């Protein structure tokens, strides 16, 4: 699992490491060496590298990267966006080292648009070291808009240092325009902005590099889930039977949406449930019976569903919601299953019903998982979607903690919030899942 941090957390860790005795200039040199190694991947010794450097410490990283690559005998050009006097102290130190290495930088303000574009087109790779992850939340000036648009328009592959310039490091929103990188080198840890909102469309491949920054007491419970983190399926003993692996009730599907019932019941069986029963309105029982494999039981229900059918069975897990429709009053049923001990998963129309009886979330006994997309979560919280996207980690974590549940907020990097405050980013999303039925 790769650790994920916010820019604020990263700054605190950075400051703590410096306070503990590691000079900031030494950290910058380590970061530059690690980045230079990755920038050089796939390049020949004759391929030109153009490093575009801002005036902050991200630009200082870029100046050091350029010096290291040039020392290897590679053709390197440096384009600075500001004069030396506007640079941070560490950047000024690396600017001086660059001059000592007999590398003369170019300055963006002294070149024509055509000259800048020719510089970009003539490179094998551009290194974006203009802005770091602490970029203020305000539109970029016209100067930087032109610079970034020129980088993107050149068609030259771009490697961004820490985060693409123009992308907010906290929530992954662009500030009007952003570098579109084919690769982003994350210093020490991946920043949240690389994975949230627009981040994945601008960061390309994300490669973290360890430069020895310590956490210094900063508690971080965010991680990017990878294949080796998922221990599934678990080994099974030979002397077992169907009830060893649990009985699942799938309450999904209704007139016009019977497919939801099929998808949910099949999914429950495929993950290894010992016994799956698909509950469906009486008029759809024959349809499900024909569509589902024979090992899945179909239980028809009518208006007496809650009293006569469901209470008579004990379930190891209950799935409720996809395609159940909005014409039946499921309030009493929700209260019943949430007062029980069996884990409950609620999705889709089930969340719509939950909105109308939110009081059942208070003090619920059953372990609970909610799986909304952004629109459904907006309705659950009463907050507009735009507000949520500006701070999804805080809002999602608070909701999961306050209601003692697991929140699975679906998206490209689906966010999983635990009631204890941990946050996991799913790494397997893809735009092909943007179709009806993926949630089911």
Residue ranges of predicted features:
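Small-residue (G/A/S/T)-rich helix-start motifs and N-terminal tracts that mark the onset
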Residues: 1-80, 88, 183, 194-345, ...
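Nucleotide and nucleotide-moiety/phosphate-recognizing core
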Residues: 36-130, 139-161, 333, 340
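Short strand->helix junction
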Residues: 84, 133-137, 168, 174, ...
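Short, structured secondary-structure boundary patches
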Residues: 96-103, 128-132, 296-302, 429-432
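Short acidic loop-to-helix transition motifs that present clustered carboxylates
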Residues: 110-113, 165-169, 192, 304-306, ...
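Internal gly/pro-rich beta-alpha loop/helix module
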Residues: 124-125, 130-222
């Amino acid at each position: 699992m790769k650790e994920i941090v916010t820019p604020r957390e990263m700054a605190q860790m950075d400051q703590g490491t410096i306070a503990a005795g590691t000079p900031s200039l030494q950290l910058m040199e380590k970061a530059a060496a690690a980045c230079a190694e990755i920038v050089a991947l796939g390049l020949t010794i004759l391929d030109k590298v153009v490093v575009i450097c801002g005036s902050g410490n991200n630009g200082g990283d870029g100046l050091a990267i350029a010096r290291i690559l040039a020392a290897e005998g590679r053709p390197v050009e440096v384009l600075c966006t500001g004069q030396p006097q506007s640079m941070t102290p560490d950047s000024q130190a690396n600017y001086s080292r660059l001059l000592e290495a007999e590398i003369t930088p170019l300055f963006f303000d002294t070149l024509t648009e055509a000259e800048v574009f020719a510089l970009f087109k003539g490179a094998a790779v551009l290194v974006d070291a203009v802005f770091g992850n602490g970029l203020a939340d305000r539109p970029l000036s016209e100067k930087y808009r032109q610079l970034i648009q020129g980088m993107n328009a050149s068609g030259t592959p771009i490697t961004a240092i820490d985060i693409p310039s123009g992308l907010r490091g906290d929530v992954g929103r662009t500030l009007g325009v952003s570098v579109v990188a084919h690769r982003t080198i994350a210093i020490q840890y991946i920043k949240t902005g690389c994975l949230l909102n627009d981040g994945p469309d601008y960061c390309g491949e994300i490669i973290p590099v360890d430069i020895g920054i310590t956490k210094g007491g900063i508690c971080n419970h965010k991680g990017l889930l990878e294949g080796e983190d998922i221990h599934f399926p678990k080994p099974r003993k030979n002397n077992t039977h169907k009830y060893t692996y649990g009985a699942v009730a799938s309450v999904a599907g209704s007139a016009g949406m019977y497919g939801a019932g099929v998808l949910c019941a099949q999914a429950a069986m495929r993950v290894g449930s010992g016994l799956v029963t698909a509950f469906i309105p009486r008029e759809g029982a024959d349809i499900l019976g024909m569509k589902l494999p024979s090992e899945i039981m179909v239980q028809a229900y009518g208006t007496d569903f809650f009293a006569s059918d469901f209470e008579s069975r004990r379930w190891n897990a209950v799935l409720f919601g996809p395609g159940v429709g909005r014409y039946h009053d499921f309030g009493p049923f929700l209260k019943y299953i949430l007062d029980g001990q069996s884990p409950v998963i609620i999705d889709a129309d089930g969340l719509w019903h939950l909105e109308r009886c939110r009081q059942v979330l208070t003090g619920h006994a059953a372990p609970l998982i909610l799986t909304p997309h952004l629109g459904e979560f907006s309705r659950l919280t009463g907050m507009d979607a735009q507000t949520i996207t500006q701070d999804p980690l805080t809002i999602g974590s608070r909701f999961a903690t306050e209601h003692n549940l697991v929140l699975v907020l679906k998206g490209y990097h689906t966010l999983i919030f635990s009631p204890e405050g941990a946050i996991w980013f799913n790494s397997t999303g893809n735009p092909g899942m943007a179709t009806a039925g993926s949630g089911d």
